[in-house]
A protein has these predicted regions:
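ABC-family P-loop ATPase nucleotide-binding domain
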Residues: 1-17, 307-311
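ABC transporter nucleotide-binding domains
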Residues: 8-11, 18-210, 214-216
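Preference for bulky hydrophobic residues occupying beta-strand positions
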Residues: 18, 31, 124, 233-237, ...
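A generic structural signal for secondary-structure junctions
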Residues: 86, 108, 112, 207, ...
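ABC transporter nucleotide-binding domain
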Residues: 176-267
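Non-catalytic connector elements of ABC transporters
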Residues: 253-311
Length: 311
């Protein structure tokens, strides 16, 4: 049994619908998020991700279906819910002349319970920037401040909308470490991202949306295995061989030739590689070069939506 299935459900979305005039932004969406997991919501632009998150957060009213977050109805109990969740939005912008510690104290005053400002400054590496104006912060420092503001009320769940957009690889890794720390503390994280490798690294489970509907749900590994994409093999041989002979090797899904190399998709790859070695020995042929690439969440995304993730 999946370990998450043994944990309490923190977010329940059942048959959710939301329309904007004649446009159905969300159509019959259902999923659960378990306590303590990092849950990724993926989809191309216009898939309905933002609308779904806004409904979960209590910012929009659904037209149909049932949503519960921390046991509360976001549409009817939004004030109570705000005490229990934190949200870091991509467009977080503070006044240019607001200092870091002022922002934290301001946000702390919005809640009945709040974390220590000093502890937040220490935790997010902002202690030396406490008196710095927002306009003087780097992109990475602004993102760390946004995360600190999302945790100012010690929430059970954090909603992160594109938390690493625009950051260089090292700063993205710093944010990854913070998100992994959230999970180690038992917090639930709902994450949207345009970086497939980010979802594959951070998320316990992901939901892929397209045109307002759920098209895939599971752990990254489950989705990759379930997709039947197969492992990609690129090989160069001592002597040419006909594609029709490669296609009948055990486990080969399809193959093609380009620029003197043979490209195979195989499932399971171990069976195909063993059969390939036997085939080459019998044919008095040999491998000159072999590259193996396992399928990725990007492959699943393209298969499900017909589009690549917009970075």
């Amino acid at each position: 049994m999946n370990q998450t299935a043994e944990k309490p459900v923190l977010v329940s979305v059942q048959n959710l619908h939301k329309n904007y005039g004649d446009l159905a932004a969300v159509r019959g969406l259902s999923f659960d998020i378990f306590q303590g997991e990092v849950f990724g919501l993926l989809g191309p632009n216009g898939a309905g991700k933002t609308t779904t998150i806004e409904i979960i957060e209590g910012l929009r009213q659904p037209d149909g279906g049932r949503v519960r977050v921390c046991g509360l109805d976001p549409a009817q109990e939004s004030m109570s819910l705000k005490e229990r969740i934190g949200a870091q939005l991509q467009s977080t912008v503070l006044p240019d002349k607001m200092r870091v510690d002022e922002a934290l104290r301001l946000f702390a005053g919005f809640y009945r319970r709040s974390a220590s400002v000093e502890a937040l400054l220490e935790r997010f590496g902002l202690k030396e920037k406490r008196h710095t104006f927002f306009e003087k912060l780097s992109g990475g420092q602004k993102q760390r401040l946004a995360l600190a503001l999302a945790l100012v009320n010690e929430p059970e769940m954090v909603l992160l909308d594109e938390p690493t957009v625009g950051l260089d690889p090292q700063l993205r890794r710093d944010i990854y470490a913070l998100i992994e720390r959230f999970r180690s503390e038992g917090r639930t994280v709902l994450l949207t991202t345009h970086y497939i490798e980010e979802a594959e690294r951070l998320c316990d489970r992901v939901a892929i949306m397209d045109r307002g509907q759920l098209v895939a749900l599971g752990t990254p590994r489950e989705l990759i295995t379930r997709s039947g994409q197969g492992t990609r093999l690129e090989l160069r041989l001592a002597k040419p061989v006909g594609l029709e002979r490669l296609k009948v090797i055990d486990g080969v899904i399809d193959c093609h030739e380009a620029e003197g190399a043979y490209f195979l998709r195989a499932q399971p790859p171990a069976v195909t590689i063993a059969a390939l070695v036997r085939f080459l020995e019998a044919d008095d042929n040999a491998l000159v070069d072999l590259h193996i690439a396992r399928p990725s969440l990007e492959d699943v995304f393209v298969e499900m939506t017909g589009r690549r993730m917009e970075a």
